[in-house]
């Protein structure tokens, strides 16, 4: 991936990363016995979009990464950046690590997300800021106004 990035072959790198992450995510879900039914992909507009999701469990992220048909990153808690193997793939996906405890840093992360959108990358955001314990949307983080 590094060589493709250095050679400026970003689209090729993105295609390889997206395919690898989709395959990994789908295998993980299958091994866990999760059956996924996807409806409505045809309703997602072309180009960069922001996917807004509540975050109810451990399989939300693999489901989104496995079944959304375009390269996209996640706005993720900064703690995820400390996990070596995951960190590398998240960076290639265009993930942005958000410090929920530091408003200035969080605003910079959101600006970074805006720049990614302008470059044509979609982003997934979990505006509640953490996994929810119910099927109801919780309060959004104060920095997120959608």
Enumerate the predicted regions with their spans.
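Membrane-anchoring hydrophobic helices of lipid-metabolizing enzymes
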Residues: 1-49
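Soluble catalytic domains of membrane acyltransferases
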Residues: 30-145
